[in-house]
Amino acid sequence: MTTEQTTMNITEIQELLPHRYPFLMVDRVTSFEKEKTLTAIKNVSVNEPQFTGHFPQLPVFPGVLILEAMAQATGLLAFKSFGAPSGNELYYFASVDKAKFRKPVVPGDQLVIEVEFLKERRGIASFNGVAKVDGVVVCSAELKCARREF
């Protein structure tokens, strides 16, 4: 009996996502189940470039980057569920609905990103996503991603 891998390290993540520093927002996948859910982490470091301007006197991780981390997690789940990208394919972040930011995320926090696959139609996949810090929801949203050739 073989056990299918349910985690991903940074090397495996970079094989699926085109993003690189400073825009790669997923450090590790701690679990996933194809066509169902994926849980990932993003370690928030004061050394990230966005903190030089957002905000120097009180560094806060931008909410739009939390959404980007969720979108990258949905791309990973989609590729693991429906096949790895060909050399000229990407998952584009297509839309976000019902985004709520509940608490600031600051350097030193570890974002735990949980995404749930809902459905796929004509190459557009729908997901629910939440991001947590210390078990507390800091952001939630509905996301859609489109698999397209470039």
Swiss-Prot record:
CDD domains listed in its UniProt record: FabZ
Q: Which residues form the active site?
A: 54
Keywords carried by this UniProt record:
Cytoplasm, Lipid A biosynthesis, Lipid biosynthesis, Lipid metabolism, Lyase
Question: Which reaction(s) does the protein catalyse, per the Swiss-Prot or TrEMBL entry?
Answer: a (3R)-hydroxyacyl-[ACP] = a (2E)-enoyl-[ACP] + H2O
> Does the keyword Cytoplasm feature in the UniProt annotation?
yes
Q: What exactly does this protein do? A: Involved in unsaturated fatty acids biosynthesis. Catalyzes the dehydration of short chain beta-hydroxyacyl-ACPs and long chain saturated and unsaturated beta-hydroxyacyl-ACPs.
Q: What is this protein called?
A: 3-hydroxyacyl-[acyl-carrier-protein] dehydratase FabZ
Q: Which organism is it from?
A: Vibrio atlanticus (strain LGP32)
